[in-house]
Structures are given as structure tokens and as C-alpha cells.
Amino acid sequence: MNFRFVLRIISYILLIEAALMVPSVGIALYQQEWNALYGFCVTYAILFLCVGLLFIITKNYQRGHFFAREGLVTTGLTWIVMSAIGCLPFVFSNEIPHFVDAMFEMVSGFTTTGSSILLNVEEMSYSLLFWRSFSHWVGGMGILVFLLAIVSVGGKNGGFTMHIMRAESPGPASGKIVPKMKDTAKITYSIYAALTVIDALLLIIVGKMPVFDAVCIAFGTAGT
């Protein structure tokens, strides 16, 4: 088991999660939701501390070979770590003060389970509601598939993309649209994003729905 390689991938995943939270931070600033903004700031501090520690631990890592067991471990750790970090804005903003409840909410999002501990999601701040909805969209295709589409981290045997796609993609099997798995990930995510945009536009134009509500609902619809 190439643990250092797996941990280095997790550090890249955390950096992607940091980027994914940026729109929510922008919404918090625009809406002047200071408690939510505080929650995101503390989360960023913890996230970058974790990334720094992971980079130190994996300083002399070697890519080596990447097999199915590494793919399964990477996928499992990604769900756990992303959910644990992703739930912190809810905790530190005090909108979902209990860590277990917030963790449940994010696991539900990133795994597209759809369950919730919230009785009325509309009572949440705009920024955290957006982050909650966005987690459903990210989990719909899988964050590791997104990583494949934008970053080159393949192992020596070229097995990284194949085993990650098999472990992360929905359905009993994953095939190639084009010869390279990386290109397949790009095409798949492009189609996924396009369908989400079309969904949101239909809700806005036909359903006469406010833009924010339409986008959040489109995230959840596309993810499931």
C-alpha cells in the first residue's frame, strides 16, 4: 500500500475543497453574513493547516504503482476528510452547532444520500445553504472524478485514473467514452455541468423561480 501517495492525493483534494468553498465565501460577504463568514475563515485555517501537515508528511513521496486497493482507500478517505472539513462552517457559524449533526449533513451531501437533520433549510444563511446544495452537486459525479479532470497525479502503472473511476463513479461499472480516462472525466463533467445550467435556466424561465433558489435546486437535481 502506497500510503504517502494516497495522503498526497488527499492533500490535493483538500485544496480543491478550499477552492469549492470560495463562491460560498463570496455570498457570505455579499449578504453580510458575518457568522457564516467567520465559520468559513476558521475552516480555511484548519484546512490549510491540514494541507501543510500532509505536504510535510509526504515530502519525499513517490508515485509508484496505484492499484485497486489504493483506489478504494483514497475514495473512502476522501469522503471522510471532505465531509469532516466541509461541515466545519456549519459548526463554527453556530447554524448547526453539533459536529455530529453537521457531519451527517455533509456526508449526506457528498454521497448524494439526500437525508437531512434540518427541519427547514430555508432558515439557513444564503452562503451555508449554497454550500450545502453545492455539496450535493459535487458528490453527484464524485470529487475524485473532478480531480481526474483537472490534475495529473497518475501512478507509474497508469492505474490511478482507472481505479479511481471504478471506485468513485456511480453505477456497477465505469467505461471509457474516449481512450484516456482523464479525457473521459473531462467530457463527463462537462455534460454534467451543462445539464445543471439547463436545469437552472428552465427553473428560472419556466418556473419563475428566483435565481438563487433555482441554482440550489439544480445542484440537488443534477446530483441525484
Give short role names for the model-derived ranges.
Residues M1-T224:
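Membrane-proximal intracellular helices of multi-pass ion channels
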